[in-house]
Regions:
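Conserved P-loop NTPase catalytic core
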Residues: 1-37, 116-119, 124-136
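Hydrophobic anchor residue at the start of the ABC signature
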Residues: 47
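A short, proline-enriched helix->beta-strand linker immediately N-terminal to the Walker B motif
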Residues: 52-56, 62
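ABC-family nucleotide-binding domains
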Residues: 61, 68
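Helical segment within the ABC ATPase nucleotide-binding domain
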Residues: 73-85
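H-loop/switch region of ABC-family ATPase nucleotide-binding domains
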Residues: 93-94
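A short, surface-exposed alpha-helical micro-motif characterized by mixed small hydrophobic
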Residues: 99-101
Length: 141
């Protein structure tokens, strides 16, 4: 039984190393607890956990909140790679530049109701703000 356990542990270590390389995790030791990492690297650990599962739809709520610009860029790269590889990503964000830069389609909600759905091709900050001020029935709130 110890032999089988050692094989599983070695496979887990190999998988962890591959995932850390894939997400470009900056950690001095692969066995370091995520709580000892920077906020950006903690977010990367979350992505590594997602990549270790065979998921095709990801719902990300404020994936870059509270992390520095360099870490945000790294998270955006990971998200773009996932989208290129067929993952569907639903991102919730309150950061306008993030929405404009990352989304293919934007759904604006106000008071729990959809007030606008827009393709990103010609999307502007003003259009998003206009929809965020509308009620779900189409009138000004």
């Amino acid at each position: 039984m110890l032999f089988r356990s050692a094989l599983n542990e070695q496979a887990e270590i190999t998988t962890a190393i591959e995932l850390c390389q894939k997400i470009q995790l900056k950690a001095s030791d692969i066995s370091a607890p995520p709580s000892s990492l920077s906020g950006g690297n903690q977010q990367k650990v979350v992505f590594a956990k997602l990549l270790n599962r065979d998921l095709k739809v990801l719902i990300l709520d404020e994936p870059t909140k509270g992390i520095d610009v360099g870490a945000k860029y790294s998270i955006y790269e990971i998200m773009n790679e996932l989208a290129t590889n067929g993952y569907a990503i639903i991102m919730v964000s309150s950061e306008m530049p993030e929405v404009l830069g990352m989304a293919d389609r934007v759904v604006v909600m106000r008071n729990g109701r959809v007030s606008g759905i827009m393709e990103n091709k010609e999307l502007t900050q003003e259009m998003i703000l206009e929809h965020s001020l509308k009620s779900a029935e189409g009138g000004e709130a």
